[in-house]
């Protein structure tokens, strides 16, 4: 064994062992400042050193840390700290998103308090106010991410609208425009009448609202009769350009090709057949309004229908709506229903719950609206992005999400990239009023390059926020320049993100990177799920079940929150977070604190130069060293597979159960005994194992591990840069581990039987063990002291495996042996009988109460299924417990 530990500040041993009480708040700020001041998170590009890089998904500049951020950041930080300790050349590049509509709405609300609108200020003055707001409030989320312990290289922080990113955005836009992949066109988009801008799908929140399904008759144009349609949106009737039925619907086959008179207008519209129509919905006959419904728009394209826009951008009706011109859309709805009723065309209405889209920023009901927008042609870009995943260049973890990704790209539509906002990357296109030239330019223009006219104006729209985000893996590293950072760390190693933005962000980064870098943006896409509450419900304001991560950090510490977010977590699946779990992990941190305190209190005479010979290790020493080596292997293997939850569970089990609960108890006798050599060996093992636990746990719980490691004997300036612990093959003891495990099984059996018999904790007992293996028999004979210290066993009698079993004893079967606890003289049988009889009487009342409930027909009829199931489960448990009481009483009668 050639590993040495150097006691930092050995003259201050008293100060080092005086850890005091564990107070997370007292240590977290201290160590984060230490890491930043010492440049721990910063690496320079180093040729010949293996790179590892992650770009932080940029939170909105308006953002407050929520549980989704906390999970996302924790998973990334674990990977980054792990690779940093493994000696990789690491970059974790942070940044913030300008969050177009979210930020603009914030500032609009701010100036509204002054009685102003953005139009009162004008574009330039309004943007000045937005930049002021960004400078004042935009760093909040960064400070909160720091509180979580995220070890980002803040010296390289980027902003989606800084000069570096802005240059990349212009280069990409103009390049795509020059290739014919960006165009202007009239298409249907999500439209917010209040914000007066197109919205991406992710900016639309769907809520189930109770509305109505109205039934109307549309008269046939050339004969008697009518077709009956059902709609949730009567206000769009003036924009109808067809009525559609399913071609398989025999009820309407004879009507296909005929025409109907469109109520409220003087137009006639055709009856068409399209497979999209659901024969079971309403009457199976639907009105088609291509300008105001995305499915109708697609049908309109298939059948070459006219697109008639009947609404203004503020949600009022326009002149194409006839007499309803100028009305609000909902006022128009009422008027149309009234008018069709007067015409005798209203049939009936039914209450119907349906999903209604709302603007995520102002909560206005979104209007599907056909407007002139800028689009990216997606089909040519989708191919290379699909091939990158199909060929395995980029892998999804879990792999099942690759099919989700491919399926979306196979059915991709052109991407609407323009937004009618002021805050954002302004579209770099200019129009010449004199010659009509349309120019896309990488730099601002002052004159038309074709005719020289100065009568030019820039397109007023800005780009979708996701446009700049799609360039994030390479724009943040200085592209289009080939910077040293880009050369070293692109492509990035891993993208960590939720499954909810695979389409909005992951796919877009893929196709932009394949187009402009001719290379994948990341090698792995590590997908995580959502954070849910204790009942598995999504956290939301309406349910009031959200947990504020900053409140959790204040109360329990960042380490406890981080460990909660990762333990039990599996890739791609949702996880549950609630205060009881966080408190449990705060207790784990406290357990480590106390174990370190115990170790430090016994290091007064510690010699860092002492290295034990193998013969000096006890069975318990060898057991814990082998357990450590196995844990080191399991943790590394699981981290490499992105099974971060399994890695955390492995450390938890070893640190709490093996080291704290078992090994420290075996160590006490040797530390306090008369033999100095025993004390030295035990000190060595305690320090060796504990410091390596700190290293293994550091990526998960960075603050407490750094603090404790700094107090323990160590070498190096910071645990964050200490070598990652790899299993030492010179300290492998699998045989001894198996022997100690069998002894522990026997001791656990003794403890369980003592508890079952209600034996006083300090009372020594006698046991008999029937052993089935000679090596185990010898092992028990030479290690009886473990039974004495850990099981309060005064005497052990070893029996032949086929010998007579003792009477009046409790028995337990464990691997390779049977263990018997002799009860005679160990317990007061009369008192024990009285205790069980009392417990039995109380249990009989519970059984009667629960049985009464389950025999009550009213309860069974009214109670929810899960409540009834719980009562049945409870009754089964009670009855099982009653059986065990009866068995115990029979046993006591024989003593």
Indicate residue ranges for each PLM-predicted region:
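Conserved phosphate/anionic-ligand binding catalytic regions in large, soluble enzymes, centered on
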Residues: 70, 227-245, 359-361, 367, ...
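N-terminal catalytic cores of NTP/NDP-binding nucleotidyl/phosphoryl-transfer enzymes
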Residues: 45-107, 169, 229-231, 236, ...
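Alpha-helical support elements that line or immediately flank enzyme active sites
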Residues: 69-71, 294-299, 507-517, 651
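Residue patterns forming the tRNA-binding/recognition surfaces of aminoacyl-tRNA synthetases
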Residues: 9, 16, 21, 30, ...
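Feature 926 captures the class I aminoacyl-tRNA synthetase adenylation module centered on the KMSKS loop
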Residues: 3-7, 215, 407-467, 471, ...
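Non-catalytic terminal extensions that flank enzyme cores
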Residues: 2-67, 90, 347, 360, ...
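Extended active-site and interfacial segments that coordinate phosphate-rich ligands
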Residues: 70-78, 227-263, 286-293, 303-309, ...
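Secondary-structure transition/capping motifs at alpha-helix termini
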Residues: 81-89, 110-123, 143, 147-152, ...
